[in-house]
């Protein structure tokens, strides 16, 4: 990720020079949001045992729950008020239980505990891991982010069918990079209102096209990565669109390539990263450093041989359908980690 940060800095310096402006301090902050969470996660992976990481995630879940209930509108009286529940609308993404602060952390905690809810090994409390899995599932749904809820439902269903230790072709990395680069270009045109004239973009994107229109008033001027926040006075709330418009398409492709390279070829890691990119396409998650640290810990631990080295086993749930997609080993369905973690 350090070379990616250097690339973003060089391109930012070029954009600032073209606009006859000095590079902004915000650029350094924005680049740190891309680079530091992965480096911190890698540090924790190498420093702590898997049992300690699971305990750390349990503490993180508890703290996130406290923060959730400290948010306005999440008091006990709000939850026992029937009128609040009656106003919930999935179509308009409206719910008093919604949380912009905690939603990403809860989803990534769910992704972590979903994988390790059946972990067996020294100093690992299986019961606590399963309780945390259920709690993180409930709070992910309560946070009422449609994409997160959709992925949670899909993961719970696929959990009965797919062996999460399975491998995907190495060619998926460039394929996903190209796919999300193209999707970002098209989504940018859609947000500008050029792709489907007459379509109600405002309601579909919950007002994010208005944020982009503020930038349009100054002809999308860029002084480098993160400069739009200074120019329009607020965050753009579309991470991939921001990289594309503030830097260029090369930076966008490099960003996608590096992140999917980190995910590697493990099925679960790729699904976790795919969610992150869909979220960055339609919303914003890079400012949420905590959620990214959790995501990188999940991805790195799943796609590395850390569990195997520490003699930790993942006992899969028995399912008739799953037997069609996975192999038996000595009459016992145990899966170990075997893929190396890709550090960039």
Listing of model-derived features with the role each one plays in the protein:
Residues 1-196, 200, 213-220, 235-325, ...:
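Hydrophobic transmembrane helix bundles of membrane-integrated enzymes that assemble
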Residues 330-331:
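Residue-identity detector for glycine
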Residues 207-212:
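Internal helical hairpin/lid segments
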């Amino acid at each position: 990720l350090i070379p990616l940060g250097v690339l973003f800095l060089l391109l930012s310096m070029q954009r600032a020079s073209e606009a006859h402006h000095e590079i902004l301090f915000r650029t350094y902050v924005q680049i740190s949001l891309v680079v530091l969470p992965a480096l911190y996660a890698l540090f924790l992976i190498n420093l702590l045992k898997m049992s300690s990481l699971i305990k750390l995630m349990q503490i993180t879940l508890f703290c996130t729950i406290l923060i959730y209930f400290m948010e306005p509108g999440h008091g006990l009286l709000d939850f026992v008020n029937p009128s609040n529940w009656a106003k919930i609308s999935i179509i308009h993404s409206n719910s008093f239980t919604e949380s912009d602060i905690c939603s990403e952390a809860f989803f990534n905690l769910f992704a972590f505990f979903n994988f390790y809810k059946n972990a067996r090994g020294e100093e690992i409390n299986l019961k606590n891991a399963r309780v945390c899995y259920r709690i993180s599932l409930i709070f992910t749904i309560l946070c009422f982010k449609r994409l997160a809820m959709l992925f949670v439902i899909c993961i719970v269903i696929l959990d009965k069918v797919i062996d999460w230790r399975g491998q995907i072709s190495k060619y998926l990395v460039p394929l996903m990079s190209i796919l999300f680069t193209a999707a970002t270009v098209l989504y940018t045109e859609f947000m500008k209102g050029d792709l489907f004239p007459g379509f109600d973009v405002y309601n579909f994107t919950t007002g994010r096209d208005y944020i982009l229109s503020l930038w349009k008033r100054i002809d999308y001027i860029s002084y480098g990565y993160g400069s739009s926040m200074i120019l329009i006075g607020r965050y753009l709330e579309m991470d991939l669109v921001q990289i594309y418009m503030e830097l260029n398409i090369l930076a966008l492709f490099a960003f996608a390539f590096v992140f999917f390279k980190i995910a590697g070829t493990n099925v679960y890691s790729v699904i976790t990263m795919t969610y992150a990119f869909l979220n960055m396409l339609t919303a914003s998650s890079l400012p949420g450093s905590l959620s990214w640290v959790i995501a990188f810990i999940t991805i790195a631990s799943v796609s590395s041989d850390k569990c195997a080295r520490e003699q930790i086993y993942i006992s899969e749930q028995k399912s008739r359908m799953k037997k069609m997609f996975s192999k038996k080993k000595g009459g016992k369905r145990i899966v170990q980690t075997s893929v190396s973690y890709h550090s960039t």
